[in-house]
């Protein structure tokens, strides 16, 4: 029998192992940051409202990390994984409400871990990685609106905020 405490522990271990592996392995094995990260750092140095290729949000977060951590490569790998595990958390929360079963919710995150875009491409913080949590939050708040079958200002507000941030 699987206990609720064990389920919670398994989820935490899954999240922490993803964070540890996908931050540490690229830091040890790569001799240079990925090109999209370097590009985002260059764009982030002047923080315009957009660039010829991408909206500004993917440059904003690396700049914040640069101001905090400086030229430490591991910090940018960590930034990328923080966005991924936050997405995992939102998917877990949505799956728990949708499936009404915590084991199935963890299984959904575990299956998500098997998708290429949630593991091998994640060391490179780019626009795709930056938008993942906001897409997940849009789906979560849309689900809340449909599931309740009543429209509340709070849910609409957060859906609008996360959709707008997702466009940035």
Segments from the language model and where they lie:
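Start-transfer (signal-anchor) and selected internal transmembrane alpha helices
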Residues: 1-22, 153
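Short helix- or helix-capping micro-motifs
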Residues: 17-18, 105-113, 163, 167
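Extracytoplasmic catalytic/substrate-binding loops of multi-pass membrane glycan-assembly enzymes
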Residues: 25-40, 50-64, 70-75
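Membrane-interface alpha helices of multi-pass inner-membrane proteins
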Residues: 46, 155-168
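Transmembrane alpha-helices of multi-pass, membrane-embedded glycan-processing enzymes
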Residues: 62-66, 79-90, 115, 131-134
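Transmembrane-helix signature of polytopic, membrane-embedded enzymes
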Residues: 91-114, 132-133
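Membrane-interface transmembrane helices that cradle and orient dolichyl/undecaprenyl
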Residues: 99, 138-158
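Short acidic/glycine- and proline-prone juxtamembrane loop motifs at membrane-interface regions
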Residues: 120-130
């Amino acid at each position: 029998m699987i206990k609720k405490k064990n389920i919670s522990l398994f989820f935490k271990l899954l999240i922490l192992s993803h964070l540890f592996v996908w931050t540490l392995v690229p830091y040890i094995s790569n001799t240079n940051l990925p090109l999209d990260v370097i590009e985002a750092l260059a764009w982030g140095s002047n923080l315009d409202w957009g660039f010829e290729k991408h909206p500004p949000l993917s440059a904003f977060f690396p700049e914040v990390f640069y101001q905090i951590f400086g030229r430490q490569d591991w910090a940018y790998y960590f930034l990328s994984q923080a966005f991924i595990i936050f997405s995992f958390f939102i998917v877990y929360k949505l799956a728990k409400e949708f499936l009404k079963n915590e084991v199935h919710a963890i299984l959904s995150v575990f299956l998500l871990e098997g998708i290429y875009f949630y593991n091998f491409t994640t060391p490179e913080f780019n626009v795709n990685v930056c938008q993942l949590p906001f897409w997940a939050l849009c789906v979560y708040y849309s689900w809340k609106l449909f599931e309740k079958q009543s429209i509340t200002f709070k849910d609409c507000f957060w859906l609008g905020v996360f959709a707008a941030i997702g466009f940035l």
